[in-house]
Amino acid sequence: MQEAFYKENARAFRETECSIAPRFQQDGKEMLWKIRGISQAENAEIWKKSGENPKRYESMVLAASVVFPDLKGADLQDSYGVMGAENLLEKMLTAGEFASLQEAVEAVNQ
């Protein structure tokens, strides 16, 4: 029974596609975002890197959870005139879209 908890027997953290910002479309179809769950170890590292600043921490967790679009891509950051995935999220999303991303990230980490 204990073997079910071994690393090699555990399922990978969840990844899911979801609707975050319907205004981003290609060929008339909404571009879905792909987000992933993060480990508690990664979460703790993000907390340290954030300087224990709650606002920065939140943005960093969201950015770390986004698989697609590639928030680290220089071309996407350049198109919004920002540097850094966290800054990109704050610039490219409306307040409601940002809230939708927060909800999706929370759900994928349950």
What residue spans do the PLM features occupy?
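Generic alpha-helical secondary structure signal
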Residues: 9-10, 17, 84, 102
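Low-complexity intrinsically disordered segments
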Residues: 1-13
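A short linear-motif detector with a strong N-terminal bias
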Residues: 11-14, 44-46
